[in-house]
Every structure is written in C-alpha cells, then in structure tokens.
Amino acid sequence: MKASPHRPTKALIRLGAIRKNIQQMGAHIPEGTLKWAVVKANAYGHGAVAVATAIQDDVDGFCVSNIDEAIELRQAGLSKKILILGVSELEAIGLAKEYDITLTVAGLEWIQALLDKEADLTGLTVHLKIDSGMGRIGFREAGEAEQAQDLLKQHGARVEGIFTHFATADEESDDYFNAQLERFKAILASMKEVPELVHASNSATTLWHAETIFNAVRMGDSMYGLNPSGEVLNLPYDLTPALTLESALVHVKTVSAGACMGYGATYQADSEQVIATVPIGYADGWTRDMQNFTVLVDGQACPIVGRVSMDQITIRLPKVYPLGTKVTLIGTNGDKEITATQQRHSGMQRLFLTQFVWEIPCMVSIQVERF
C-alpha cells in the first residue's frame, strides 16, 4: 500500500507544533534530563522519518518498537541513538550492530538463546527492561536483572540503560503508580552496578509526576500534542496538536424521510435531510464503529450517519454545500476545532470507552497522504 495523492483525504502535520511541545517539555523537566522522542508506529501516525528529521536537533535519541522502524530511520540519515522498546528476534543482533541500534533485553531466556546460538555480542548495546507492574515484558526480580547484566557484559555487550513503564501514570489515583515506582527503585538499589541511563517517564509520568524523573524521559503522545489522560487530568501546560485530518465532499444529495444509509441500514432519516459522502473509511483508519462521530463542515458539527465503509462515510449536512467543500475530521474548520480527544469522547454514548486518544492518529493508514 502507498499514499493516494489523487483524492482529497489528507493528513497535515505541523512539525513546528511537535518542536514546540518538545521545548515545553524541556522547560518542565529538570535541567540536563535526556529527551528521547518516541516515533514508533510511524510516529503515532504523523510520519516517522519526517518527524525525526525535523526534531533531531531537539532530542537526544529516538525510541521505536522494532528493528525495521529503527533501520528506516538510519537509512533516512538519522544518526542519533535509537532504542528499540520491544523484544527483538534473535536474528536482529547482526542488524542492530550494523546500524548501531540499541536493543531491549527483557529475559534471561532470550540471552541464553543467543548464547546457545554462539552469537557474537561484542559491540552490542542494550537496555534492561524491568517489569515493575505493567505485566508485559521485563525482569521482575532484581537477581534476574543482575544476572542478565553480568552475562551480557561477560560476552562483550554494553549494558547502557535500565528502564520500566508505568501502567497508571495518566489516572487520578497514584496508588498503583507509587507501588510500581517503589518496586523499580528497590531493584535499582539492590544492583551492584546501575547502568548509566535510567528512565521510567513516559509522557504521562513526565507531565504529572515530574518529581520521579531519573535521567531520561520518553516523549510520546504529549510530543504530538495529545493529552495522555484524554480529559481526566489537567495539563500542567498547553499542548499543541500536530495532526489535522481533512477530506472533502464528493457527493451531496437530499433524501426523503425513511431513507437508509450504510451497511445494515443502521441509520434511517426521520425527515428530509441533506446527506453527503466523504472519501475516508476504515481502510484509512476511520473505523467502522465511528458511526455517530462528528466532523466539521463550514464551521458546523455534522454527524456521521450510517456505518463507516471501507473508503467512504456519509454525513448529515445542515444544508446543501458544493462538491469539494472541506471536511475536517481532526483540526480547525471556521471558528470551530475538533481534536482527537473530542473525537474519542464523541463516541462515548456508544460505549466507545476503550478508545485511547492516541489510537486515532495511530490508526491513520499509510494510504492517507501526509504533508
């Protein structure tokens, strides 16, 4: 799949907004703290290479989820450090050394599997992942982390960092967060030698628990202008959303009362209505269950009526508008703005409660051209 430039559906990325958010984060955290930009998942849908290139002078390194994302940045000419946050396949060792990419080590069995294959770890740089309560990957006991560090160093690898990830930093209650923090601190305190880089702060932790920062932070959703909590917690400073998602009206018609829209005929007009078609759908990341979400036309909120199709939606207009009229799904239209957070909440009445604010930009597919 590649971008489709010959249709009106576009993602407009304000790289200046991302840089501004980074600068504000820098003013919020202790001086000297390293800033790592999380550009996994195509930079949360904003375009990994374009974003990383624009901000390379503002950050100390990049975080990605896998070796292919890391290599993409290297092949684009990015020279800053790159950390893979997930577990890599054993075969990625050679590529990691070739492209100077830092791997995450999360278990003794992974190290042993490498040693069983007689892999050469000389020149490999790694960070140890601690599972302090997220429950995904990582060492849960200090002894295991220490053993891993010893094994890696014995076989030529450089253990540069150690990190964890908080599960509830964006929630009102601090109880579980504090329990995780104490667990992580206890593991660090029990180690004979703590690696140089210690990081536990994702965006939420950095925003609302700045006093817990070690010596590096990982900037994800906040870098793109997204509130990690949705609207649960107030931000300590304003964030500027970087993504605008736009399309245009390609078909407009007036229908009579009783007319149905979309698969399953889930919407039926209760009066004469103006219905328009917009060329965006679930193949673009605007998912099927976003029926009833709102878009902006001429500064007015217009609901999506009928189920979202693969590459089209139907919306209800207040009046007839010309073909080509701009439709804003995320961003500003006239004197109105609709954000990813507001889109998330517009589906609340339909029990769309599991949608996190950063999922929406992440889902914008590669076929939507980015500018």
Regions found by a protein language model. Name each.
Residues 2-15, 19, 69, 88-90, ...:
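Active-site anion/phosphate-binding pocket segments in diverse small-molecule metabolic enzymes
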Residues 28:
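Conserved PLP-enzyme active-site core in the AAT-like
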Residues 2-5, 9-13, 17-20, 33-199:
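Active-site-proximal beta-alpha core segment in soluble small-molecule metabolic enzymes
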